[in-house]
Amino acid sequence: MTNKTSPATESATYPVLPLRDIVVFPHMIVPLFVGREKSIRALEEVMGTDKQIMLVTQINATDDDPEPSAIYKVGTIANVLQLLKLPDGTVKVLVEGRSRAEIERYTPRDDFYEAMAHALPEPDEDPVEIEALSRSVVSEFESYVKLNKKISPEVVGVASQIEDYSKLADTVASHLSIKIVEKQEMLETTSVKMRLEKALGFMEGEISVLQVEKRIRSRVKRQMEKTQREYYLNEQMKAIQKELGDSEDGRDEMAELEERISKTKLSKEAREKADAELKKLRQMSPMSAEATVVRNYLDWLLGLPWGKKSKIKTDLNHAEKVLDTDHFGLDKVKERIVEYLAVQARSSKIKGPILCLVGPPGVGKTSLAKSIAKATGREYIRMALGGVRDEAEIRGHRRTYIGSMPGKVVQSMKKAKKSNPLFLLDEIDKMGQDFRGDPSSALLEVLDPEQNSTFMDHYLEVEYDLSNVMFITTANTLNIPPPLMDRMEVIRIAGYTEDEKREIAKRHLLPKAIRDHALQPNEFSVTDGALMAVIQNYTREAGVRNFERELMKLARKAVTEILKGKTKKVEVTAENIHDYLGVPRFRHGEAERDDQVGVVTGLAWTEVGGELLTIEGVMMPGKGRMTVTGNLRDVMKESISAAASYVRSRAIDFGIEPPLFDKRDIHVHVPEGATPKDGPSAGVAMATAIVSVMTGIPISKDVAMTGEITLRGRVLPIGGLKEKLLAALRGGIKKVLIPEENAKDLADIPDNVKNSLEIIPVSRMGEVIAHALLRLPEPIEWDPASQPAALPSVDSQDEAGTSIAH
């Protein structure tokens, strides 16, 4: 080998090409991709002259337009061998380094970098020492290439053939995996001896690191041998099973089930059960019937939302806005939901409430539950309980039965995919029971906040937590087993007033009718007067279902008229509504047209809301018999007997001769005859009808009444006051007599109802007679000898405590 020294050369001007993340050494042939405008112009300048360019590395690779101070002083003068312009505007250039050079100063050119530079000479050095160093470098380089797989082995052969020590040092330096700063340091070193020593030092350090890396890889490989061995054995087992005809998918299914078990947040009990079932499944033939049962079980168990919760919205203003937008009125329910959200915003451990919405059909119980789910951010699932008679519908069947499945509760939870949905149990009062069990008793565990955290389905046989579920049940009446009702917070939803129905129509029903019938708002309109006419003359209900049907009918007729070309716009008014809906079905006004003897208007509370109840009484010659008709049940029959006994005991005060009762028969009838009726709340109406019949004094047609009567003439409180008052308002009644103890319930009655009715609380039957009859009966004198001896005074107060009648 030889050590050539380069004589010092004079300075010359060269275009400068700043490089990023690369240092080009002399004797290297390197392809470069050039994209910066200045650099491209520098290359164009070079190609037009002697093709010599100065390649210098910039200090910061991220700098797009570096200042001269941000570029290293020492670089390489190179020849441009080839230049190729690419379609994207960049230039590919092939350069060959010639010699080291140092920049003296930059020339003031703006279009590209240009600098005055001079080549750096190499000093004279001891050739023997350099020869020894070069041999060590080549030997070490061979070891380095063997360990570093990124360098081609051919490079070692090339390096060993190089006779120029300077070229050898630069070639080795260019292939080392060292930092740019260290490569630049090698470039700036002119001494061949020092370059070889640095290269040797860098290689020894890299070889040490690579040897440690190799040892680590060997150790990891040994640790992985066991896993790989098991993998190979499993692959062989799969191949054997495939040859034997077993399904390859069966093994994949096992791996999938195992992965699902590990990823699902099962409870400790459920995880143990799942692992046991999977172990059992591994030992079965995939084609066996029992394997299908186990697979189905694991699918159900892993398909449940274990610990997956929806994020509950706690923004009270947003919740109120959603509830008010979807439903008009229903303030009590909305208030309860907002209270729950308020508490939940403070405490995340609060259990979901269990509400029971009780009210007549069509008042929005089911749709309100959907609205609550939207307001709280919960998933909504609905389970219809109407007609459910089998306890297994709730708790599921045991796995011993063929075709067994979990109950509807677990099925719904899987469908919801979240562990905290809003669960609507619809029509809970319509459940039945037979020899298969009582589903209402199975619901006791589901709806008990203290127990439902450990709900156990017969099919799953592991406990599942339902405590985060918000349960809402709906019912038309409280015909629910007491233990079940005790677990729920009952919220009554009475019917709507006429004003509320009109608002509901304007906000919800009319826009829905227009949307569903593809009408435009400017094509179809219904005036407020027409809406009131529909409410009063074509529907009589607590809810708005029939009201909606009538509005849909109006929309259909409007579409028909528009398509026939009769008109471009249909406006329904109170005057032309008969043309669309026909003859009015109901008469809005008093229940009776005239004041009549023995005919009184009572108020009843049914599962479809409040109703007017006409009670008729007639008297005829006979033997003192009392006849009652109208499909009356036991409680109402007893109520009539109590009313008759009260009137008979007060006969003289009412101007009735006592012997008259033995010579006359009284017949009390409650139309309609086909409708079953029960309850004690018509007692005051019965007594009023009997007094009117016996005295011949007519009853005012615009009075309705409700209340239970005692033998002493006291009027006891009743239930369903709001529904009864709404029925009186719908029927055009002007004056309503209610028990005095129900006066406290008037606070829950809408103001427009109280303002439209004259509501009079009464405590004794004498007050009822005074308000109901057109005139008071006059007491008569009666021969004491003909009266029974020592009867207690009927005016004495009843000593018994207050009893509540519904």
Curated annotation (Swiss-Prot):
Protein residues bound to ATP: 359-366
Keywords, ordered alphabetically: ATP-binding, Cytoplasm, Hydrolase, Nucleotide-binding, Protease, Serine protease, Stress response
Residue span(s) of domain Lon proteolytic: 594-775
GO CC terms of this entry: cytoplasm
Region: Disordered, residue numbers: 786-806
UniProt-recorded Gene Ontology molecular function terms: ATP binding; ATP hydrolysis activity; ATP-dependent peptidase activity; sequence-specific DNA binding; serine-type endopeptidase activity
Disulfide bonds: none
Principal location: cytoplasm
Any Gene Ontology biological process: cellular response to heat
InterPro entries named among the record's database cross-references: AAA+_ATPase, ATPase_AAA_core, Lon_bac, Lon_bac/euk-typ, Lon_lid, Lon_proteolytic, Lon_Prtase, Lon_prtase_N
Active site per database record: 681, 724
EC code: 3.4.21.53
Swiss-Prot/TrEMBL catalytic activity: Hydrolysis of proteins in presence of ATP
Localization: Cytoplasm
Domain Lon N-terminal: 14-207
Induction (record text): By heat shock.
Function: ATP-dependent serine protease that mediates the selective degradation of mutant and abnormal proteins as well as certain short-lived regulatory proteins. Required for cellular homeostasis and for survival from DNA damage and developmental changes induced by stress. Degrades polypeptides processively to yield small peptide fragments that are 5 to 10 amino acids long. Binds to DNA in a double-stranded, site-specific manner.
Assembly and oligomerization: Homohexamer. Organized in a ring with a central cavity.
HAMAP family: lon_bact
Protein family membership: Belongs to the peptidase S16 family.
Protein name, as recorded: Lon protease
Lineage per the UniProt record: Bacteria, Pseudomonadati, Pseudomonadota, Alphaproteobacteria, Hyphomicrobiales
Gene, per the UniProt record: lon
